[in-house]
Amino acid sequence: MKKNLFYLFALICSMSLFTACDDDDDEVSPWIGTYKIAEYTAEDYEWPENETTKNWPMTGALYTDWQFTREDNYPEFISALFRYLGGSILPQVLNSITLDKSGSIIADYVASPEIAMDPSSIISIFFTGAFPSVSDVKANFVTSGFTTSPKDLAYWSEKNGKFVVKLNIPAILTAATGSDASGMGEIIETVLSGDPATVKALLGGLLNADLSGIQNATINQITSWAKDGIPMNIKIADNGHVHIYLDKSAFDNLFTLRSTGETDNFGKPVLTNDLIILWNALVAGGVVPEEAQAAGIFIQMIGGCWSVTTNFNLGLDLVRN
C-alpha cells in the first residue's frame, strides 16, 4: 500500500506542476485542454573544453532551467541528468493530462507501474560521458493499459499571477488505500493547522523518524501548500511547448545546506538540508519504493550547488494534444 501511495502522490504532484483557469467564469482559459508530455529528444553536446557528451537530453517530460555562478558546468550536467530521468520515468507512468473546464485535473496513467530504471545506467553516464540512446530510453515507454483518474483528486485556479493547484488529500488517500478517507478531512485540517513542532512530531511518529531538524519555515511552507494550494508558474516556450514549473523560491528552504554540528572522518563539517532529512525519513518509513531510493543522491548534489544557484526552474514539459 505504501508503494502505491508513493507513486500516486508522485503522480498527483507531477499533475500539480500545471494548472489553468481564471477565477472569472465568464472567461475561458486558454489552457483548458489535453496535454501529452514532450517527446524525448537528444543530441551530441560539445562542451567549451572541446569534449563531447553523446545523447545529451534536450527535451522530455521534465523541464529544467538551472542558472549558476559556479566556474565548472556541474549544475548544467545535473540538469541534463534530471531531463534524462524525468524523460525516462514519467512516460512509464503518465500518458496524458486534461485540464477540465470545471477545475478538475484528470490524468491517464498506469495504476501500478513497474518502473524500468537500472541504477547502473546512471553510474555509466558519469564514467563514459554518454547518456543512453533515444531508442533505448523510449523502449520502456508504456503505450497502453492506462487508467483515468477521478475528477476530484486535484483542482486548479489562477490567482495573483500564479497557477494554484489544490490537492484533495482525503480523496488521494481513498484512491491509494481503497478505503473511504472522506471522514479524515477535519483531522487533516487540524494537523495542517498545528504549529510546526506538533506537525513534525506527528509526521515523525507515523514514519518512526526524527524530523525535529527540519526548519519551521519549511513545515509552514508545506502545510500552506497543502491547505491553500501550490503556487506555480506557466509559460509557452520558444518551441511552442508549455512549461509549468516551480521556481527557485519554492526550493530555497528545502535545498539550502547547513551544518549539523558534527564532523566527518576527515574533520569537515557534516552538512544537511531539509529535503535530505525528509527523504531519509520517508525511506526509513518504507514510503519510498526500493527502486526510487537512490534518487536521494540527487538531493545532495543539488544542495551542494545551491549556494551558487541564481535561477532554478523545475516542472513539466508539455505539448497540447
Stretches found by the model and what they are:
Residues 195, 288-289:
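Intrinsically disordered, low-complexity coil/linker segments enriched for acidic/polar
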Residues 77-273, 279:
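Contiguous, well-ordered beta-strand patches that form the walls/edges
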Residues 4-5, 14-41, 308-321:
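Bacterial Sec-dependent N-terminal signal peptides
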Residues 28-66, 70-73:
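Tryptophan-anchored aromatic micro-motifs
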Residues 300-309:
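Short, exposed beta-strand-loop hairpins at the edges of beta-sheets
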